[in-house]
Amino acid sequence: MSFNTLINWNSCSPEQQRALLTRPAISASDSITRTVSDILDNVKTRGDDALREYSAKFDKTEVTALRVTPEEIAAAGARLSDELKQAMAAAVKNIETFHSAQTLPPVDVETQPGVRCQQVTRPVASVGLYIPGGSAPLFSTVLMLATPARIAGCQNVVLCSPPPIADEILYAAQLCGVQEIFNVGGAQAIAALAFGSESVPKVDKIFGPGNAFVTEAKRQVSQRLDGAAIDMPAGPSEVLVIADSGATPDFVASDLLSQAEHGPDSQVILLTPDADIARKVAEAVERQLAELPRADTARQALSASRLIVTKDLAQCVAISNQYGPEHLIIQTRNARDLVDAITSAGSVFLGDWSPESAGDYASGTNHVLPTYGYTATCSSLGLADFQKRMTVQELSKAGFSALASTIETLAAAERLTAHKNAVTLRVNALKEQA
């Protein structure tokens, strides 16, 4: 189906509607699964030697020192323009402001007299950040991951990226306070972070995007008792735009293409009650495509994308909630009026002047978002992902005495005698003290 084809939602059967919202299939092939499993086992067993061998094999780079030196980091910064450094600093300031505001106050309540319950927050002690390499290094992801890690107070922050690591990534890491950076990429980097090696320290939780091998490696280590936790399930990038008759077609087209150029498996969807706007957006997409260096990639993504005409904006919102996009852009008049009705989205962008690029780089929100429908149960990355919560309770004698019979009754009903005895023994001790 061509992206220029307008689809009337209400003319489609329920089966056709479900098909329109079906994402491009992602599944690790058996060969990827086996290859990744072998890499994990090899790195766990052979450590640094395996990491160097994989760098030579996959990255075509001979790596002697896995850890990047302070001198190399300083030299990388010296090669960057002041303009880029200032832009990074401005982005970090906004990211820091937004994520610092997410700090939760401690919970400290008396549930009944003499029964004090608290919830306290602690940082995840050690985190690993994976940053993909390639022709377009995602240094902005360093800012998005390392900044909340620093605010959360994570003691050890370790970054891995395929060699040779781009200057932008090294400088961004230094800017955000990352001290340990390693020339390791791919599934082998995930293995090193999960299990540790002679050079790379083992971490408690791994963050960051990657290709199919990295994604599969993260999945596998998260399911191993000796592995590590991960940030969230990963999938192709996606955007859904809701537009009304007042939307600017060129703006809508640019937002759709900003996702389509990510990869051939990306998906973009336009929902609008105005068929004329849909046609104008399709024309604007074609015009802008002609000027994009990554036009071929974007065209492949558009083949699985949709222009859907609806009855009204309320139906647009209902369809969007059913789809649960990673990015939701609302280019309508009074866009904020629709926010309360949105139930599933990774990040929402309101109005003509809130392009998705703002959230990707510098508005302050995090660009690491749930995709592939995981917005139904997962949240956008935030400070809480670098923290853990624990509860504390303290009962006074009076508080314990008042609650004792309740605990004994419940424990007896569950036939957990030792639980009941732990209370009964104390009740008897209090009676003896009286």
From Swiss-Prot:
The active site is at residues 326-327. Keywords: Amino-acid biosynthesis, Histidine biosynthesis, Metal-binding, NAD, Oxidoreductase, Zinc. Binds 1 zinc ion per subunit. One of its GO terms (cellular component) is cytosol. PROSITE patterns: HISOL_DEHYDROGENASE (PS00611). Coiled coil: none annotated. GO terms for biological process: L-histidine biosynthetic process. GO terms for molecular function: histidinol dehydrogenase activity; NAD binding; zinc ion binding. Its cofactor is Zn(2+). Substrate binds at residues 237, 259, 262, 327, 360, 414, 419. Its EC number is 1.1.1.23. Pathway: Amino-acid biosynthesis; L-histidine biosynthesis; L-histidine from 5-phospho-alpha-D-ribose 1-diphosphate: step 9/9. It catalyses: L-histidinol + 2 NAD(+) + H2O = L-histidine + 2 NADH + 3 H(+). It is an enzyme of class 1 (oxidoreductase). SUPFAM superfamilies: ALDH-like. CDD domains: Histidinol_dh. It comes from the Bacteria. NAD(+) binds at residues 130, 188, 211. Zn(2+) binds at residues 259, 262, 360, 419. Belongs to the histidinol dehydrogenase family. Catalyzes the sequential NAD-dependent oxidations of L-histidinol to L-histidinaldehyde and then to L-histidine. Homodimer. This is Histidinol dehydrogenase. It comes from Salmonella choleraesuis (strain SC-B67).
